[in-house]
Amino acid sequence: AVPLTIAQLIQLLYNVVDRIYIGHLPGTQGEALTGVGLVFPIISMIAAFTNLFSMGGAPLFSIARGEGDEKKASYILNNTFTMLVITAFVLMAVGYGWERPILYLFGASDVTYPFANDYLTIYLAGTLFLMIGTGMNSFISAEGFPKTGMLVVICGAVINIALDPLFIFVLNMGVKGAAIATVISQFVSMILVLRFFHGNKTLYRISGKYMKLKKVLGIILISSMFVFLVAGCSLVDNLKTFKENDDTADTKEQNQVIVEDD
């Protein structure tokens, strides 16, 4: 339990570290932080899809192993992998296709949109890395190697922390640099996870032999309803917050006009 808890805590560092460094950007730190903050609901949606499959698949995988049904366990692992890959490409397509309207729906303005767009455009490119690296990591722990799973997460987090200042300040890439550092760290985590499932420790390998695409697509369609409901609630909450901020700004402007008239 301890390695899993540590891994989850470290996973939270990705976005926190980005915001810490972005908060030290000279001159535009406020707008940059706001822009990156607008992307977090989208990141949460990607994480929700990842957890949907991994947290559902890993326990079923463990149950199948406990029953001694190795074939069923292999099917569960490989079908989860397939769902993660398909969903990642779908989310990338939706994100790139409706990036601008989605960000404005979440409350972007003409000032904050460029920062949000820069971060999201690069971050979406790493959706597959994130979903495989995080989603399949649950199966590493379920197979009995929680420390290995923890080390994968730690490795990704350390790389992100190390690369952030390099790309953001040294290479002067700003928000784009933060996103690039995150994507690189997620890519490394994915490679480590895939290497595990093709190494000597594991008894279960990722193989097309155990992937049933028709069943997987059916599960995706059914399970996606819940995630879209959560995403919808997040959207409504962001729109409400945006409207409240907009109303506050209008009130301040009206008060300023009254003062000037006086």
Where are these regions (language model features)?
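Short alpha-helical transmembrane segments in multi-pass integral membrane proteins
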Residues: 1, 61-126, 172-219
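Residue-level signal for short hydrophobic patches within transmembrane helices
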Residues: 1-13, 17, 42-49, 125, ...
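Helix-loop interface residues and adjacent transmembrane-helix termini in multi-pass membrane transporters
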Residues: 13-16, 24, 30, 64-67, ...
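Interfacial/gating helices of multi-pass transporter permease domains
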Residues: 22-44, 111-115, 175-176, 215-216
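Small-residue-rich hydrophobic transmembrane alpha-helices
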Residues: 33-93, 130-149
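Alpha-helical transmembrane segments of multi-pass membrane transporters/permeases
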Residues: 84, 139-162, 180-183
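C-terminal motif of bacterial Sec signal peptides marking the signal peptidase cleavage site
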Residues: 231-232
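N-terminal, intrinsically disordered, polar/charged segments of Gram-positive cell-envelope systems
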Residues: 237-262
